[in-house]
Amino acid sequence: MTETSYIMAIDQGTTSSRAIIFDKHGKHIGSSQKEFTQYFPKEGWVEHDANEIWNSVQSVIAGAFIESGIKPVQVAGIGITNQRETTIIWDKKTGKPIYHAIVWQSRQSADIANGLKEAGHEELFHKKTGLIVDSYFSATKIRWILDHVEGAQERAERGELLFGTIDTWLLWKLTDGDAHYTDYSNASRTMLYNIHELKWDEEILKILNIPASMLPEVKSNSEVYGVTKGFHFFGSEVPISGMAGDQQAALFGQMAFEPGMIKNTYGTGSFIVMNTGEKPHISKNNMLTTIGYGINGKVYYALEGSIFVAGSSIQWLRDGLKMLERASDSEEVALQSRSQDEVYVVPAFVGLGAPYWDQEARGAMFGLTRGTTKEDIVKATLQGIAYQVRDVVSTMKEDTGIDMSVLKVDGGAANNEYLMQFQADILNIPIQRAGDLETTALGAAFLAGLAVGFWKDLEELKESYEPGKIFQTQMQEERREELYAGWKKAVNATRAFK
């Protein structure tokens, strides 16, 4: 590996695709981003055009090379990280998708999920996959496409169709159809993968009538899956050597390599993931059990709590209530509040995620008086994000018995100093902000680089990690518990109002 070698991370997200080029020290030297179309055919449905996603990825690869000034031949390996659960089915010979990609947020297969519950399959799915039965995951989306595209079931049974999440689709396209693989982390989000036996589950496939021939082979998160075909990568054959779903990539990028290490990504929603080590913890409290990552012949499991609304509640203050000009203004406005924290905002705009999993709940405000100001509402909205994180972290502690010493954070809202300080106060543990908030792409780059010897081992990765600011608890215990008790009352009242 020469001094002039680099690693490229492709970060394929829900609204945009990005490519970032990293050097040996984990610093990005060039990047490019491109948004793509969101399709909403019916209420609750969300779809993407898989070919448009592929075109956007090709565009950002070129853009990253232009910005960095490096040549494709200098790329030692490519890591892919992706929006998870989003489902694509395509023709094996032509490479043409038979339907739009059904996005993780989409509820169009909810009836299939409800049918599985009514048939009494919930416990079986939970034990084998670690997941709750929900249309969030890929399994019901596959079944929906096979049911609604004419002839699809028969074609799948004849071995003519392939399924993949976004990682698999991009790998297949980059290798010109040579590689049909996925990784442990993405497989564990399909609701088809047995996380104990590390294989596609025959009983589940039979229940859903999904032919096994459609499914990609599952590999580790750090190995060479194939090489780019020259015409897709400007004349170079570069190994694709790392893959992970976005939240697991962020866990790896945050260096959460030991059991009990926990990270939270504050994005549109908030995703708290804890490394639980080499044995899965099946949650008794509605946390998702998933695979964190598999490297060097070992698989590390994780617990995940998904919060549906985090950063999007700040966007609501800006766009819906017109209380902010810019989302970043929320910190300054919150600090102007003179309230005693008696206002609570429960941002259940699309229901409540973990640990409640209440799709029917809707947002509410409590404690309003004639004296309540917009500053109070902005502050309470930020606090609502932090309270939800405590709900999840407390539940994880109850599930595992593990005391967390620090919460590692990243994502856009982690820049909000007021939110981070309140988060430390309400959790009573330090908050460590990442020095570089691009931890998702960095995790994919790390996985790719380890596989090709760009980095030697985890110890060398740790040397490149630069933590950002640490926020220490400043609140008294009595005050903390008083505030949190008020939040629990607000959530209970919200759930009662339907």
From Swiss-Prot:
GO MF terms held by the record: ATP binding; glycerol kinase activity
Keywords, in A-Z order: ATP-binding, Glycerol metabolism, Kinase, Nucleotide-binding, Phosphoprotein, Transferase
Pathway the protein acts in: Polyol metabolism; glycerol degradation via glycerol kinase pathway; sn-glycerol 3-phosphate from glycerol: step 1/1
GO terms (BP aspect): glycerol catabolic process; glycerol metabolic process; glycerol-3-phosphate metabolic process
Post-translational modification summary for this protein: The phosphoenolpyruvate-dependent sugar phosphotransferase system (PTS), including enzyme I, and histidine-containing protein (HPr) are required for the phosphorylation, which leads to the activation of the enzyme.
InterPro entries in UniProt: ATPase_NBD, Carb_kinase_FGGY, Carb_kinase_FGGY_CS, FGGY_C, FGGY_N, Glycerol_kin
Catalytic activity: glycerol + ATP = sn-glycerol 3-phosphate + ADP + H(+)
Positions with a binding annotation for ADP: 14, 18, 268, 311, 412, 416
Modification Phosphohistidine occurs at: 232
Residues that hold sn-glycerol 3-phosphate according to the record: 14, 84-85, 136, 246
Residues given in the record as ATP binding sites: 14-16, 268, 311, 315, 412
Known regulation of activity: Activated by phosphorylation and inhibited by fructose 1,6-bisphosphate (FBP).
EC number: 2.7.1.30
Presence of keyword Kinase: yes
The keyword Plastid is assigned to this record: no
GO cellular component: cytosol
Pfam families xref list: FGGY_C, FGGY_N
Residues annotated as binding glycerol: 84-85, 136, 246-247
Function: Key enzyme in the regulation of glycerol uptake and metabolism. Catalyzes the phosphorylation of glycerol to yield sn-glycerol 3-phosphate.
PANTHER family registered for this protein in UniProt: GLYCEROL KINASE (PTHR10196:SF69), SUGAR KINASE (PTHR10196)
Similarity comment: Belongs to the FGGY kinase family.
Summary of subunit composition and partner proteins: Homotetramer and homodimer (in equilibrium).
Protein name per its UniProtKB record: Glycerol kinase
Gene name of the record: glpK
